[in-house]
Amino acid sequence: MLRFLGYLFIFSLWLLQSMEIFAASKDKNPILIICSYNPAAHQTSVTISDYMEEYNKLGGKRDIIIENMNCKSFSESPLWSDMMTQILSKYKGENHPAQIVLLGQEAWAAYLSQRDSMQVKVPVICSLVSSNVVILPKDTMEHLDSWMPESVDIFDDHLNIPELKSGFINRYNIEDNIRMIQAFYPKTEHIAFISDNTYGGVTMQALMRKEMEKFPDLDLILMDGRRHTIYTIVEELRNLPENTVIMVGTWRVDMNEGYFMRNATYAMMEATPAIPTFTPSSVSLGYWAIGGVLPDYRKVGGEMAMESIWIIRRITG
């Protein structure tokens, strides 16, 4: 069943029907949550907390194990597949999980990159991810900072992931953001796209490049955090050509792997006070970006727990 909430996709592979979900299964295999980031990080912490609270309310009895990949910058990306393999290798045989919950883009991408090698595939839920992905490189690359991967959409490109039973997936609408820019600023000739040195930044840039092919009259200027510090990107922003509009994708980590919060986008804003700015992701919205077509961001931990129990009940009877 496919349910649409704005651009947030929640999907399941079985028709929803009334059922008792409060009885605990006799099978005590755990639920394994694999996080991209430290579980203490705010969004991850809130999602896990809401999940566990609702899971307990619904009568869930299985142990919940949390593993952390502790992903940082995109320069580490060739290591993530092996990290996922090592985590999953701890839960084999009688200890295999009843269900895997993947939280975050990096955990999701790492799972996709090595799922074909898994001998036993258990039901999977993904959350805090987007529909557009790039397939992780299998080996260390010399020029990872200039790698231009293809954007793949798990819906449009029909990826075959039968064990994926449910997901809370954001879909970024770059095309409508560009059309909004053209409607407000019809003289636009260039779009400067800002992305950072994270997996999320690389995937969003790949999507941006793909969608810009629909607009051959527009020039795309990439402001890539894999090759910029906050200081060099501010200097580049000061030298943008006329009739440019800025689109802010994401900014957390620069080429030196320094972490920045809102102060970085404030510095960018101060460098470009007269250039219109939009965002497809809500980054800088309200103080720099004047608008954007956004996913329907909201808390989903409680709904994830409902899906978990429903899926396990469906499988175990």
Indicate residue ranges for each PLM-predicted region:
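Bacterial N-terminal signal peptides that target proteins for export
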Residues: 1-8
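Short hydrophobic alpha-helices and adjacent helix-cap/hinge residues
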Residues: 21-317
